[in-house]
Structure formats: C-alpha cells, structure tokens
C-alpha cells in the first residue's frame, strides 16, 4: 500500500526519475513471471507509471533462469559492487531505503535468529529457510541496508505493534532485525495508530518531536 500511496502523490512526476536507480531489499526465489515476485508487485503499484531508465532498474535474479540461488545472490552482490565502483567490495550509499516490518520484526528476508542476520559483509545472501513461503529468497545483508543515508520504515496494523515497540526500544537485532537497521543520516518510522498502540508515552513523544 505504501507504493500505491507514492504513485498517487500529486508531485510524483516532479522528480527526474531518469536519474533514479531502483534496487530491491529482497526477492522471492520464484520464476520471473510469478505474481509472488516483489518486483512484479512494485511494477503494478508504481514502477510502470514512472519514466525510469531501464538500465537503472536492478532486479534480483529469478528462479528458472539457468542460475542457482547461491550464484543468484552473488550476482546481485556483484551488481551492487559494480554500481558503487572502485576496487573495494562496497555497496552503494542508497539515498532512501524503504522497509516493511514483519510481525516478528523481520526486514527484507532477514529473519530473527537466522544465520543471515549475522552476516557482516556488504552484498546479498541466499535464504533457504524463510519462515514465510516461499522458503527460498535473496536478501540484502544488514550492513548493506545500513549503507543507506535514510532508512524509512512503514508499518500498519495491530499485528505490527509489538515489533514496532521492541524495535524502537532497541531489542537486540539478532532477535529483532528491524532494530538493527539505521540510516547514516536518518531513520524514520511511518506507522498508523494500530501499529503504534504499544508505544509508551515517552517513546511516542520522543519520535513525534523528532518527526
């Protein structure tokens, strides 16, 4: 729904979209034509309406394209390194990284207690055991997410209330990956009243003051 809201913004086309690079935080390991792919949903909600440069839309590889999941993640990491440039294996400093939050506090396809949460390298990793179907996915690592200048969280509904509360309280990121995502310049939370229902008054006041 957040992408639909962006698509409906009256000043949407004021931006020079030809200069914008589009990346994915994660992707489901399904065929390119699958309705379950995040990029298909993003196309339908927003991207198909924008005058984007096709060379700057960086889709994650799809299943059934002659590449296995491990190599698909490596391929996406290589694309990140290529766009960043230089000899170091660094990923771009994203201007804005938009993240949803699961009821369990997962972000992208980094799930509580799973091995990928511990990964300290910049790049992308394969996921074989997602608690949510499909089990196989590709995800940016947490250090890659934390290269973003601005991290924007979007959470709505009562099932997100506990995750929002614990993330803002700073629960250990291994147990709640959302608490480990921080922009280098800013981190913002966009939540509805239901998702904010468990916030203490002092925490709510702190974030409203800094909004």
Give the residues covered by each predicted segment.
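Glycine-rich N-terminal segment of FAD-binding domains in flavoprotein oxidoreductases
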Residues: 1-12
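A glycine-rich beta-strand to alpha-helix segment
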Residues: 1-2, 80-111
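Short, conserved loop/helix-junction motifs that constitute active-site signature segments
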Residues: 12-21, 50-52, 116-117, 143-148, ...
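Ligand-binding beta-strand-loop-alpha-helix segment within the catalytic cores
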Residues: 13-95, 209-211
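Short acidic/glycine-rich loop or secondary-structure boundary segments that cap or lie
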Residues: 31-33, 68, 104-111, 117-119, ...
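Class I SAM-dependent methyltransferase SAM-binding "motif I" and its flanking Rossmann-like core
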Residues: 96-143
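ATP/nucleoside-binding phosphotransfer catalytic cores, i.e., glycine-rich phosphate-binding loops
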Residues: 143, 149-211
């Amino acid at each position: 729904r957040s992408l639909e809201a962006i698509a409906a913004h009256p000043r949407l086309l004021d931006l020079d979209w030809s200069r914008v690079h589009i990346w994915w935080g994660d992707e489901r390991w399904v065929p390119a034509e699958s309705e379950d792919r995040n990029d298909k949903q993003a196309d339908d909600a927003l991207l198909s309406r924008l005058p984007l440069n096709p060379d700057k839309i960086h889709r994650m590889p799809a299943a059934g394209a002659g590449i296995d999941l491990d190599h698909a993640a490596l391929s996406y990491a290589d694309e990140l390194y290529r766009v960043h440039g230089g000899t170091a294996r660094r990923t771009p400093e994203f201007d804005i990284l938009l993240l949803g939050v699961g009821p369990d506090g997962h972000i992208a396809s980094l799930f509580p207690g799973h091995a990928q949460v511990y990964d300290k390298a910049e790049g992308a990793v394969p996921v074989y055991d997602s608690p949510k179907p499909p089990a196989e996915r590709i995800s940016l690592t947490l250090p890659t997410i934390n290269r973003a200048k601005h991290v924007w969280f979007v959470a709505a509904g009562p099932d997100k209330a506990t995750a929002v509360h614990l993330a803002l309280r700073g629960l250990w990121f291994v147990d709640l990956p959302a608490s480990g995502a921080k922009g280098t310049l800013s981190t913002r939370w966009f939540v509805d009243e239901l998702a904010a229902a468990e916030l203490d008054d002092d925490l709510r006041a702190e974030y409203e003051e800094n909004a």
